[in-house]
Amino acid sequence: YEIPLRLVGSEMCIRDSIIPLTINDSAWNLQYSPYVYYNEHCIVFNNQHTPMKIERATFRKLLDFVGLFPHYFVGSNADLPIVGGSILSHDHFQGGHYEFAMAKAPIEKTWVFPGFEDVEAGIVHWPMSCIRLTCADDTRLVELADKLLTAWRGYTDESCFIFAETDGEPHNTITPIARMRDGKYQLDLVLRNNITTPEHPLGVYHPHAKLHHIKKENIGLIEVMGLAVLPSRLKQELFDLADVLVAHLPTAEYPEALQKHAAWAEEILAKHPELNADNVHLILQDEVGHVFAQVLADAGVYKLDEAGRAGFVRFLESVK
């Protein structure tokens, strides 16, 4: 996977300029983010202070937006805790003039939904579980996306540890992304589930504890699409880790701030006997990318193995 990396702080700021828009016959605004995680990174938000919710109207709004700005993508964070990823509770999207790694990923398995033979559909070859829909008629995409959302909200497959709800708490939702592709509308629907267990109290489909030294935070829209938004602490930690790796310092002697990376450091040294002062930073960047790929795999509800692929197909077959 082509995985760009970004190190960020904790505060969200937005430039002052506001561009009014009409999407789904309602008043929205566009602002550009100073973070610039990617080219022309923008926030699109509802004039009315309404809670974020993934529903049929969400797909209509996303497709209206890319109809206005066909060179932009736009997407929404999911609407449940753990898998949401947003620090804003207000109804909003994120967009920009950028092609993420997930957008470049090919279809792994094509699919035809009954009654929607005019919609190109399939499973995307990506660590997270993504259904891609493409059609020249955006209303058809809205109809099929809504059908898939409704089906997923109520779907349980115990053999894949997918439960629609436990004790009345809903677990299933979708992270949707829209774009134009060769003159057609396209939606990527990423299946999400926020169930927790004693073994994984932060989420079964969330970065597992072994990876928390790199990424512990929620996997939101930007990460889903393949851009690693990493905690700012890593900038100094990786520089310091490079020094101790080159010096072959025993992990027991690592500074306290680097102890969390000790097991990973041993894996890196075993994997890269050629490591030296000239290549250590490139090696670390590459290895962080591998960790982030595993982060996405942890967040995927259907794993990239035989059982996961079979489970994904069972869900698609259930959509009538």
Feature roles, as predicted:
Residues 1-14:
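Short, small-residue-biased leader/transition segments that mark boundaries at the very start
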Residues 16-35:
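Conserved oxyanion/phosphate-binding beta-strand-loop segments in alpha/beta enzyme cores
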Residues 17, 49-74:
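Helical scaffold of the NTase/Pol beta-like nucleotidyltransferase catalytic core
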Residues 57, 70-86, 95-156:
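Catalytic or ion-translocation cores adjacent to nucleophile or general acid/base/metal-coordination motifs
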Residues 122-320:
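C-terminal accessory/tail domains of diverse enzymes
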